[in-house]
Amino acid sequence: MSKLKIDTKRRFSLLIALVLIISLSSCATTQTNVTTKTVFNQETTYHNLLKLKKWQANGVIGIIYDNQAESANYTYLQDGDNFSIKLYGPLGIGSIEIKGDTNSVLLANSKGQKLTAKDAKTLMLEQLGWYVPVEGLKYWIKAIAIPNIRQTSELNTNNLLSKLSQNGWSISYSNYQLVDSKYPLPTKIRMSRDNLTLKIVIKSWQI
């Protein structure tokens, strides 16, 4: 094979690689820390976050219940009413996935078992002894209240939620990141109800 043909192939390969890099970069989610000097318009922020219907959050969750403590890595995807929560790591039961919508929920574990129910709470209590409030989480993880349901809240110096009480849950937020230059989203959340406490650390957002 001639040197000219080899050089042409190399140039073509480099061109393809460059196109892929540019494509991936354009789809990447940008995240910057929210400084104490940044003050957001509360109404604009709320409506922007309310309209945000699709995202992926990755991180670690700590669970404290009945004098027990567990932790796991998670990947949480939301697309409208459809959701998927994958838990894996030191849970002691292998990986599990809970997915569903407003009508039904499926729980699948690493042993190949699949269980269904009308809501995530029922399945998770039966299988894990604790639960994630999926119906509220799709709002609370964005640091906004469920619309048209009674709540009390406090704001921080950035005009973002620092505390929220709703549906029997007490939720506190610390640390925010500005995602895609538009969405101030939390990176640390603590949720408590009765004898259950969830500590959620969000390491990355993708929207």
UniProtKB/Swiss-Prot annotation:
Per the database entry, which stretches of residues form a coiled coil?
none
- Lipid attachment, kind S-diacylglycerol cysteine: C27
Membrane-crossing residue ranges in chain numbering: none
Disulfide bridges in this chain: none
Covalently attached lipid (N-palmitoyl cysteine), positions: C27
Ordered alphabetically, the record's keywords are:
Cell outer membrane, Chaperone, Lipoprotein, Membrane, Palmitate, Protein transport, Signal, Transport
Primary location recorded for the protein, binned into one broad class: membrane
A GO-annotated cellular component: cell outer membrane
What is the protein's membrane topology class? Lipid-anchor
GO terms (BP aspect): lipoprotein localization to outer membrane; protein transport
Q: Which Gene3D superfamilies match?
A: Lipoprotein localisation LolA/LolB/LppX (2.50.20.10)
Signal sequence region: 1-26
**Which cell locations does it reside in?**
Cell outer membrane
Q: Which family does it belong to?
A: Belongs to the LolB family.
Q: What's this chain's function?
A: Plays a critical role in the incorporation of lipoproteins in the outer membrane after they are released by the LolA protein.
Q: Subunit composition? A: Monomer.
Q: What is this protein called?
A: Outer-membrane lipoprotein LolB
